[in-house]
Design a protein with these regions (language model features):
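N-terminal targeting or signal-anchor segments and their processing/structural boundaries
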Residues: 2-651
Length: 651
């Protein structure tokens, strides 16, 4: 590239974005403006050298407004102090608060922030550059940031370059050049000088342009980035009218590389363990909350009570970060105040887990006396209602008996049960005893009900939930009955009688999906997803196959996780260890399964790049609505229009 052309390219390159495709058509109600603002002039001029003033002024051909300027306008090098950005009539004025750096190219990437004042037509991909030295750096690096766990495009994430190739640069120094991802996860870092770089992505919570907080989402690339450029040719088309081509012209343009950098964003596991709070909403239960999981339960010592065999301990997450203590003894839960010491593992200033003891005074938000008063008031109110109804009874009508308070039980037993499913009994408090001899599960055989065997056990994650397993014969009818008083709760209430009738689905109501997987690691599993990207089932990949049986008709997606450590779950990354998150791949289509059908799909997990794998139907991060005003009737378009603006370069 000739030196003069290279020097002017970065500044004059705005012409690539200035004259975007525009046409004027006529519809009912008159002409509709689709034309974005056009650049007229600027101070300094585009590509100016040796510029040393902090103010930038850009003028357009019409009145303009700015859409989310602090979010959409990206300035390189990044500014520590927030610049002042405002629109004034036909001008955009930016005043930098930081001192200008010597021999540095400054780039202002406006994205689609500049819009005409009336219709909101955006001037897309507009950027502006000047240099404080005698050279204007003009190369660019582009790519995509995806959520490493689910390949969702990450919007609004900062992406930056470091010429300092040391690992510590990301954690100690601000980025040298930056870009920001759009709604498709795409980014472009402009005004880059020749050289070698490391590239990172960062959700910059403290706005210091460095990875300084463990809660920040990050991404890093294992490879060194070396920007380059090449000349390419493309065809531009001019039109006589909406249907007739005038001329097809080949134009040369400069393309910047790399343009396909892929960054997989993740948040590191936080190992900062500390006690968060104690809570006692009701007299019978108090809870301890910690900021992170622990391998062991805290050691609890009662100071105004005996803690031995005093509680039923519930761990709803199974990870010891939330612990519920159900108090067994009525004398104990009648106390308004429970004083105790707890010893637990705490993360010290050296990031080491050490024992720590805190003293707590856990007060009941609802005291026992107040609870009993509320119950008595509710009972008296109910009694008054009963007295009113009694007075209205007609001769011969029988008064309803006073209701008995039973242990609350929620029974999951759908009327049409899946052949692989099971029944569930959920309680509002721990269970003290269960008499399974009072449980009766029967199958209808030739019009007669016959007892069938079942397994009944407590759920492994929830001590207040119990599951009943049996072999359901497809298409057959069942009844499940529990005698009254078969179950006693921790606080003395008994269950009412239970009766549920249901029928197992027929095999022809199901379909199957079989994946023949190519390219997966030796340890991998596939998650079957619903239309909202939620996991329905998980199966391991065995001999290159992942099979899903007994599926209800519907739409399904699938993702594969290369399970590097073989623990059966997706694992995040760690920057200090230079460990990337485990790889995730999506089957690139949503499958529609019909009843009584089998689908066999060949799946080469690397056939498409990661940014093209996840089906749009499963994405939660949708592309922003195109703000360009589309012609409402292409057949009525009048006059000549250029479908291609003849841009001289691309990113």
């Amino acid at each position: 590239m000739r030196p003069l052309f290279r020097r002017l390219l970065g500044g004059v390159a705005i012409a690539a974005a200035l004259y975007s495709c525009a046409s004027v058509g006529r519809i009912e109600g008159g002409p509709y403006d689709e034309t974005p603002p056009r650049f007229i002039s600027g101070t300094p001029t585009p590509g100016a050298l040796h510029h040393n003033k902090n103010k930038l002024s850009i003028e357009f051909d019409e009145f303009i407004k700015l859409d989310k300027p602090n979010e959409k306008i990206v300035i390189s090098p990044p500014q520590v102090q927030q610049p002042e950005i405002k629109s004034n009539g036909k001008k955009v004025v930016i005043t930098l608060q930081d001192t200008l750096k010597p021999n540095t190219t400054y780039t202002f990437d406006f994205g689609d922030a500049i819009q005409d004042n009336n219709e909101g037509n955006p001037l897309e991909n507009f950027f502006y550059s000047f240099s404080t030295g005698d050279r204007l750096d003009s190369m660019a690096v582009a790519g995509t940031v995806l959520n490493a766990a689910n390949l969702e495009p990450v919007k609004g994430m900062l992406v930056g370059l470091h010429a300092n190739l040391a690992d510590s640069a990301f954690t100690k120094l601000p980025f040298e050049r930056v870009g920001r991802t759009d709604s498709r996860g795409r980014f472009s870092i402009r005004g880059v000088a020749p050289g070698k770089y490391r590239i990172y992505a960062l959700q910059d919570a403290d706005q210091n342009f460095a990875y300084s907080q463990p809660t920040e989402v990050i991404a890093f690339n294992d490879s060194i980035i070396i920007p380059s450029m090449e000349e390419r040719m493309r065809q531009d088309t001019t039109w006589i009218d909406s249907l007739t081509v005038d001329t097809i012209v080949e134009r040369q343009y400069t393309h910047y590389l790399p343009d396909d950098v892929l960054l997989r964003a993740f948040k590191e596991l936080s190992f900062s363990q500390r006690f968060l709070k104690a809570e006692r909403l009701t007299p019978e239960k108090f809870s301890l909350y910690f900021t992170a999981p622990a391998d062991t339960l805290p050691l609890l010592k009662g100071l105004n009570f005996n803690e031995e065999d005093a509680f039923v301990i519930e761990q709803p997450t199974g990870r010891n970060d939330t612990i519920h203590y159900w108090i067994k003894d009525s004398l104990l839960y009648k106390q308004d105040s429970l004083k105790m010491s707890i010893t637990y593992l705490y993360t010290d200033s050296l990031k080491q887990l050490v024992p720590r003891t805190d003293t707590l005074n856990v007060l009941a938000k609802l005291t026992y006396d107040k609870q009993q008063k509320q119950k008595q008031e509710a009972k008296e109110k109910e009694q008054k209602e009963r007295e009113k109804k009694k007075k209205k009874l007609k001769e011969g009508e029988v008064e309803e008996p006073e209701p008995t308070e039973f242990l609350a039980v929620d029974v999951y037993a759908p009327s049409a049960i899946d052949v692989y499913d099971y029944l569930t009994l959920s309680f509002t408090e721990p269970v003290a005893s269960i008499d399974t001899a009072a449980f009766h599960l029967k199958q209808k055989v030739d019009s007669l009900w016959q007892d069938i065997p079942f397994d009944f056990m407590r759920d492994s994650l929830d001590l207040k939930r119990y599951n009943l397993f049996a072999e359901w014969a497809p298409g057959e009818s069942y009844t499940f009955e529990v005698d009254s008083a078969a179950i006693r709760g921790l606080y003395g209430l008994f269950s009412d009688k239970i009766k549920k009738d249901f029928k197992a689905k027929k095999l022809e109501e199901y379909g199957q999906i079989f994946f023949n997987v190519h390219g997966a690691d030796s340890l991998a599993f596939v998650e079957l997803l619903d239309g909202q990207d939620k996991v329905l089932r998980t199966v391991p990949v065995v001999d290159g196959k992942a099979d899903f049986y007994f599926l209800n008709p519907g739409k399904y997606g699938a993702r594969l996780i290369n399970d590097t450590n073989g623990n059966g779950v997706w694992d995040t990354g760690n920057y200090a260890e230079k460990r990337q998150p485990e790889m995730v791949y999506y089957y690139p289509m949503v499958l529609e399964l019909k009843a009584n059908f089998d689908l066999t799909q060949e799946w080469d997990i690397k056939a498409k790049s990661l940014d093209r794998q996840k089906p749009d139907e499963l994405k939660k991060q949708k592309p922003d609505e195109d703000k360009k005003k589309q012609n409402r009737n292409k057949n009525n378009r009048s006059g000549n229009s250029s479908r291609n603006s003849g841009r001289g370069h691309s990113y």
